[in-house]
């Protein structure tokens, strides 16, 4: 399972790290788009397998941000 960017923007803060156990509703990262901060939250449970982005990185809509197992 993967978290993809719902919009183009800039990653402000990554709130998880590989190996973290996540639950539904956990905050994963914040993304700035059109001068607004958006918190992306988990829609499932699992463990963070890999993070493909870094803070301050510009991302495109649909880009894979985090992979879960």
Predicted regions span which residues?
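Structured functional modules or segments
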Residues: 1-69
